[in-house]
Amino acid sequence: MSKAGGNKGGVKTGGRGGAGSSNLQVRVKKKAGTIKESSRRWLQRHLNDPYVHKSRQDGYRSRAAYKLIEINDRYDLLKKGQKIIDLGAAPGGWSQIAAKIVGSTDENPHVVGIDYLHVDPLPGVVLLEMDFLDDEAPQKLMDALGDKPDLVISDMAAPTTGHRRTDHLRTVHLCEVAADFAISVLKPGGHFLTKTFQGGTENELLALLKQKFRSVHHVKPPASRAESVELYLLARDFKG
């Protein structure tokens, strides 16, 4: 999970079954007419997830925080003083980690997040409650940040339909929009990290990123559930 050298900025990390995990399994009983079987399974998995327990212990907004921690431990993306834009920020886990590592404060914010869902305030983070797909969103993000970002991160995913190919295509579209934005605003040498789903239709996106960045590859951090089709695309060293 972590590369040699350990944590950045004092951020805590956790592995599968790490501190706070337990062999005691929580079982969610189904009462007739009260909960769907699929919902019961999701709730039981959530309640028994060691990352969920650890996120509560460490004070993180969500288990997704560990995905960014683990990716950063491996690739050293986040550094003190950087400017960061977080797309699809709710509930705030990635913005929270980014602000802590880069040293963002309310007086001198270096992290701007955007989501159409409400995100409770976070220290050192400017939060925009609007849809990133709105025409005005890109300029509002840049105005709030006040400078070109060193890193654009996106954990956006379209609401799932249950149809794997449809879900993949909708999320790839969000990736493409996020990539276009990152390419238009990043500093030379900057990085772009975005969620995608396994599905094999992102060839055009990969070709674009390989043209604009010096290194592009897929990443699946340990905090991403093994059974999930979720992957991350990491594009490093923007050519400008």
Swiss-Prot record:
Catalysed reactions, semicolon-separated: uridine(2552) in 23S rRNA + S-adenosyl-L-methionine = 2'-O-methyluridine(2552) in 23S rRNA + S-adenosyl-L-homocysteine + H(+)
Keywords for this protein: Cytoplasm, Methyltransferase, rRNA processing, S-adenosyl-L-methionine, Transferase
Pfam families: FtsJ
InterPro entries assigned to the protein according to its UniProt record, in alphabetical order: RNA_methyltr_RlmE, RNA_MeTrfase_FtsJ_dom, rRNA-MeTfrase_E, SAM-dependent_MTases_sf
Organism annotation: Brucella anthropi (strain ATCC 49188 / DSM 6882 / CCUG 24695 / JCM 21032 / LMG 3331 / NBRC 15819 / NCTC 12168 / Alc 37) (Ochrobactrum anthropi)
Gene Ontology MF terms: rRNA (uridine-2'-O-)-methyltransferase activity
Active-site positions on this chain: 195 (proton acceptor)
General function of this protein: Specifically methylates the uridine in position 2552 of 23S rRNA at the 2'-O position of the ribose in the fully assembled 50S ribosomal subunit.
EC number per UniProt: 2.1.1.166
Protein name as it appears in the record: Ribosomal RNA large subunit methyltransferase E
Region: Disordered, residue numbers: 1-27
Biased composition (Gly residues): 1-20
Residues binding S-adenosyl-L-methionine: 92, 94, 115, 131, 155
Gene Ontology CC, one term: cytoplasm
Family that this chain belongs to: Belongs to the class I-like SAM-binding methyltransferase superfamily. RNA methyltransferase RlmE family.
Record's subcellular location: Cytoplasm
